[in-house]
């Protein structure tokens, strides 16, 4: 079931956020994600966040600010079950256009977004992580 994030679930989604980022971005020091943990948590109430709940456990979430996908994360133990696809499909049902950034080296995420109909827009350098990012967009 997909539903809005509840404040009492902030710790769970931040746990998913931290460990998914560390696992998916081995090319970025883990301390980068740890150092940005509190800042990201503070932004949760300002974002449109939807969670995928399965048997009363939050398995993943998608965070949006307007038409921008700030993040899509699924807990490792729930990957491969279509939860990421379902969360993105939900966001697509609410928006006619979506944009996101993905690290160039994150091949799994790039493949996922391309399969979901996202197209390449531009490549740019992220000073904070010292990595190239790709901007992708989707339009209905």
Feature locations, PLM:
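Conserved beta-hairpin
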Residues: 48-60
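Conserved active-site alpha-helix within GNAT-family acetyltransferase domains
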Residues: 85-86, 105-122, 126-133
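A short, internal acetyl-CoA/4′-phosphopantetheine-binding micro-motif in the GNAT/acyltransferase core
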Residues: 68-79, 102-103
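Conserved acetyl-CoA pyrophosphate-binding loop and the N-cap/start of the following alpha-helix
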Residues: 78, 82-90
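Conserved GNAT acetyl-CoA-binding A-motif
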Residues: 93-105
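Conserved N-terminal entry element of GNAT/NAT acetyltransferase domains
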Residues: 1-8, 140
């Amino acid at each position: 079931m997909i539903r809005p994030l509840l404040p009492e679930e902030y710790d769970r989604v931040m746990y998913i956020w931290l460990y998914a980022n560390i696992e998916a971005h081995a090319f970025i020091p883990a301390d980068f994600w740890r150092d940005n943990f509190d800042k990201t948590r503070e932004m949760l109430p300002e974002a449109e966040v939807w969670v995928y709940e399965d048997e009363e456990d939050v398995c993943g979430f998608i965070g949006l600010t307007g038409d921008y996908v700030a993040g899509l994360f699924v807990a490792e133990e729930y990957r491969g079950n279509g939860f990421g696809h379902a969360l993105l499909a939900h966001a697509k049902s609410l928006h006619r256009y979506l944009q996101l950034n993905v690290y160039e080296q994150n091949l799994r995420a790039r493949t996922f977004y391309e399969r979901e109909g996202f197209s390449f827009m531009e490549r740019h350098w992220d000073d904070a992580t010292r990595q190239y990012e790709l901007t992708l967009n989707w339009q209905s």
